[in-house]
Amino acid sequence: MATAKVLLDTHALIWWAIDDRALSRKVRRLIEDATTIVVVSAASAWEISTKVRLGRLSWPTTRPIEAYCAEQRFEVLSMTFAHAERAGKWPHAHGDPFDRMLAAQSEIERIPLATNDEKIDAFGIETIW
């Protein structure tokens, strides 16, 4: 049996961090399963940091996001030129740069994206919720 691998959308990461019931049972079980490789994009750190700076979000810990991810044993996925180029080339109008980056990473790295954002469906990537 192959090991499951999942890329967390930013809201999934936040909901996991604050133990929010909005996180689906399926995604919660995947994260809790020690055999699942849970991946967090640097784009999520960028998005969270931006929203904290703008006062739109409160990150639940004083630890840096990367340190939190390490404590959770999440893998960190850096953004590459290939990711950036793919994120910029999609023809549809979904304008959120963070979602575009996460979708590009999901497609290129062949990792399903854990998201409940229906707008992501326009990218044609594999999602889990």
Predicted ranges, named:
Residues 123-129:
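Acidic, glycine-centered active-site loop in nucleotide-sugar glycosyltransferases
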Residues 56-62, 66, 70-116, 128:
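Active-site neighborhoods of divalent-metal-dependent phosphate/nucleic-acid chemistry enzymes
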Residues 19-20, 51, 90, 126:
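Residue-level signal for well-ordered alpha-helical positions
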Residues 48:
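Phosphate/NTP-binding elements of NTP-utilizing enzymes
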Residues 12, 44-45, 83, 102, ...:
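Alpha-helix capping/helix-boundary segments
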Residues 40-41, 79:
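Short glycine/serine/threonine-enriched helix-capping/active-site loop
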Residues 1-40, 54-67, 109, 118, ...:
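Short, well-structured N-terminal submotif of metal-dependent ribonuclease cores
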